Structure formats: C-alpha cells, structure tokens
Amino acid sequence: MSFLGQVRKKALQANRRIVLPETSDERVIRAASQILKEGLAQVILVGNQEAIMHSAKAYEVSLSGAKIVDPYNFERFNDYVNKLVELRAKKGMTPEEAKKLLLNNPTFFGAMLIKMGDADGMVSGSSSPTANVLRAAIQVIGTQPGVKTVSSVFIMELSQFKDLFGSILVFGDCSVIPVPTSEQLADIATSAAETAVKIAGINPRVALMTFSTKGSAKHECVDRVIEAGRILRERKVKFRFDDELQADAALVKSVGEIKAPLSDVSGNANVLIFPSLSAGNIGYKLVQRLAGANAYGPIIQGLNAPVNDLSRGCSVEYIVVLTAITSAQACVDC
C-alpha cells in the first residue's frame, strides 16, 4: 500500500476533529468538502456561518457534516479569552488583547479550540505565514512532555528505489530550526522516530548525519552531532540510532560496513537527521527533484497536539492530504 493509502486508512480509523480556520480561502472550502466526502476527519471551520455557506454554494460544493464555529457568536468565547490570558500571563496579555486576537486571528482561535478540548488538531497556513501558525501552536498548545523542541519532518516516498533504501525515508528537520543545538538534535531525532512509527508505519533506524563518519573529520559541527548521540544514550531511548554518519554510510550497506562496521544502523537507516536546516531543506528538495520522490510535509512534531502548516501555494489536494496526516497524528490508539 502506498504512503497516501496508509495515511487515508489511519485517518478513517482516527476520525478526529480537525480545525480548518482559514475559511476565506476557496481552497480550504473545497478541501473541507472533499475531506467530509471521504470521511477523513470531522471538519471544524472557523468563521461566519452565512458567509461560509455562501462560499460553498458559489463553489458548488457541499459542507454537510461540517461544524462551523463563529468567534463572534460563540457561547464559550469568554472562557477562551480567560484561558488565553492565563496562558500568556507572563507576557502581560490583557483580556482586551486576548479578545482582539481571538476575533481577528482564526489560527489562534483554532489553537484555542484544541487547548479547550473542542478539537484534536489543526491545519492552517494557506493564507498566513508559517510564523503565525507556529506562534499560535507553541504559545497556546505547547510542546509534548519531555520535549522542548518543535521541529518538522518530510516523509519521502521513493517507490522506484525500494529495493535499495526501502520505499519510505523520514527527513528532519527541514523547515523549522536553522542551527539546532545538540539537545535540539536529540529532540528532533526522538520526535522523528515517533513520527516514523505513527505516520509512516516503519520501524525507525535513526542516523544523526554530518560530514564525518566515526572520526574521519574534526570540527565543532561534528562535535554537536556526537553530543546529540550522547544525550540520546543518556535518555535511554528505545529506538535504534547512531551518530556521526555521512549520508552514504547511513544509507548504503557496502559503505556502512567499511566506514562504520560496528554501527547498529549504518547502511540501513530510514530516519535521517540533518545537522542544520540548510542541509535538511536542500537534501529533501534534491531527493524530490532528482530522484522523483514524493515529499509529504513539513509535518510539524513535538507539539502537545498536532498542528500542521500549509504552503501559501498549496493545492486543494494537499490540504486534504495534510488533514489526513493531522488526523492520524491525533489518534492516540492508531
């Protein structure tokens, strides 16, 4: 089964409540209709009901089964305001500021729906910058217990190379942290291993990569990766991993046997942790464009509830796919 087939199956099983807050965007309305039609999630739309239904009629799509929440006419609005003031107390947020934010920023309102137990996840960003989506997620929802770092992965589907590398590789971090510290690299690896199991359906073999394999080069950049491995060992994580591996040593069995013969994952890694955002972003795009891989992401990880960010150039179909991924992320038992 393809990756998308697996994700759709998990989303159908999960049937989670996913917020799509940017209802002024035609693509979001069309995607919501498709999600409802396929049964991939319980859709929650943020905005004026009359305006949303008018849009659906104009686009000739059905929103039957969607829940529409209007911040201007929401019975729990004051509770939301009070909770947001509590969450942002250290920053001195006033009730008036909280009210204004929730009325004017649907992504923040969507995050509060999750925080208050009225939704399970959110997909946003089609008409707002990544910074707005991540700010709402971090400030309102926060990170998972034991994880301080919000990061991302791309799931790379390489069906044509499955005999060499397997059909699925997980790349992280490719879109959030420019120069991660050792502790952040350890967090990224931990979250990526969890995503590999939950979303990609693979047993993670994690390689923390750099330009050196087992002492072949010396540099502070290499030291940072080695230290990340030490932190993971100290944490006694349950997934297989190794640090200080070059890409060929991580992926190619014959090279791994020469460069890192004692490694538990060399030549067989399927979760690749890049030492910087530059490396990760370049890496996934090279594999996508030159190897013809399908790239699914960025999938945000490390949050206390799933929130995923859309590109402002996204398609309707991609909103559907990312909603299915988010629904699967939100499923505790899946």
Predicted regions and their residues:
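Anion-binding alpha/beta catalytic cores of soluble intermediary-metabolism enzymes, centered on
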Residues: 1-266, 271-334
